[in-house]
Regions:
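Beta1/beta-strand and adjacent pyrophosphate-binding region of the FAD-binding site
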Residues: 3-18
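C-terminal helical "tail/cap" subdomain of flavin- and related membrane-associated enzymes
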Residues: 330-418
């Protein structure tokens, strides 16, 4: 069989949010690239389906018309105005994402099935600068001199694609990471999650608040209930792999047990129906700084282990890291420098400058979650104090305020009502 030769500036492995985010901005910068995707869109992706304000920010920067399209499609995208924390003792706390809500203000976040979101993003990628191969199987990734070469099979044809740079946007089982980085996850930096779609869950917020239930048996993980369009809800659990292994937890049994027996949750599922199967996936958490690039390669999204350790949200950071990768690539192309040293400065350092504080705080909060008494204490105090609720709300947009959660002085102030 004849091997077809292709060359480009950048190869992107994976067409999910991280790959799409990279592609959008490479197109903006006029940089040719080839996207290689193993599946065919639309395709499902197991996920919590919640999108933070970071998702909206990147999409808006890519093209404001795309965000307007999302905000105007209530059948596919459900605006979310806040979050409900349920403490281990069952007490709940509603926290809006913003205190400055008006009729003209778009919701800071939204929920959407990943099949819908990823297909939306995928269909925005085609451009004169972007060539896409779907249903393509990569058999080899190698560095050849100052370039990278990817060998793939597509529609019974074999291709060798050569480029100056390769982007690993291929998820937590990334081939690019495995080949070039040596970056790997451990049970302490990896979580496992289950996702189920239910129809007919009652008691959902009229403002579509997402819910995090910190059940004692799941700490430092939680059970979530996220409202979706058309009366659906994404219901799931996420727990550190280390905890699952040590306690020999059966996630599926634990989730279903909570749905059937928990006094706050069970009545809401009395007439709910499971739609499809309960499915699992892995979450590589950003618990510590890692090397995100090297000679001729950059890792983005889950391949770069950039999932928020506290919230478990990865879509926003996937898109955001893709945008930052494209910015770094623009500089690399201008300087004709694709070395690890240059990319570390142009990409790694920028990622951690933009996201580092947020991720460090989230990692600390994730560790604090195992203290039931502390969680119960903060929720109890916040239920009685409007000013404390407002402070917690402001933490969603103010990283310095959020940092207070790591400090003992914050809890002393709550204790003495200061």
């Amino acid at each position: 069989m004849t091997v077809q030769q292709l060359s480009t500036t950048v190869i992107i492995i994976g067409a999910g949010p991280a790959g799409a985010g990279t592609s959008f901005f490479l197109t903006k910068y006029g940089i040719p690239h080839i996207v290689i995707e193993k599946e065919t869109f639309p395709r499902d992706k197991v996920c919590g389906d919640a999108c933070s304000g970071k998702t909206a920010l990147v999409i808006n920067r890519a093209n404001p018309e795309w965000l307007a399209e999302i905000l105007g499609d209530a059948q596919s995208f459900l605006p979310s105005w806040g979050i409900t924390f349920v403490a281990p003792d069952g007490k709940s706390l509603d926290i809006p994402f913003t205190l400055a809500r008006t009729q003209e203000t778009p919701a800071p976040g939204f929920t959407v099935p990943r099949m819908v979101l990823d297909d939306f993003l995928f269909n925005k990628m085609p451009s004169p600068y972007c060539t896409i191969f779907q249903n393509a199987t990569v058999s080899e990734i190698a560095r050849v001199g100052d370039s990278v070469k990817v060998t793939m099979t597509h529609e019974r044809a074999i291709y060798e694609v050569t480029a100056s740079l390769i982007i690993g946007a291929d998820g937590d089982k990334s081939m690019v990471r495995k080949q070039f980085s040596g970056l790997d996850t451990t049970p302490k930096t990896y979580a496992v999650g289950l996702r189920a779609y239910y129809e007919g869950v009652t008691g959902l917020s009229k403002d579509n608040f997402i819910e995090l239930h910190f059940l004692p048996e799941m700490l430092p993980g939680y059970l979530w209930i996220f409202p979706l369009p058309n009366g659906m809800a994404n219901v799931g659990v996420g727990i550190l792999s280390e905890v699952v292994r040590k306690k020999k937890i059966n996630l599926r049994e634990q989730m279903l047990h909570a749905i059937k027996t928990n006094p706050q949750i069970a009545p809401r599922f009395a007439n709910a129906k499971l739609n499809g199967k309960i499915q699992g996936w892995g979450l590589p958490l950003a618990m510590e700084r890692q090397n995100l690039s090297g000679d001729n390669f950059i890792l983005t999204g889950d391949a770069a282990c950039l999932i928020d350790p506290f919230s478990g949200e990865g879509i926003g950071n996937a898109l955001y890291s893709g945008m930052l990768a494209a910015m770094a690539i623009q500089h690399a192309v201008e300087q004709n420098d694709f070395s690890g040293a240059f990319l570390k400065s142009a990409y790694d350092d920028v990622v951690y400058k933009r996201l580092g504080d947020e991720l460090r705080i989230s990692a600390a909060l994730q560790k604090l979650c195992k203290y039931q008494w502390l969680f119960n204490f903060v929720v109890k105090k916040a239920r009685k104090s409007a000013s404390l609720r407002n402070t917690i709300s402001a933490m969603f947009s103010n990283i310095d305020l959020r940092d207070q959660l790591r400090r003992p002085s914050f809890y002393l102030k709550i204790l003495f009502n200061r």
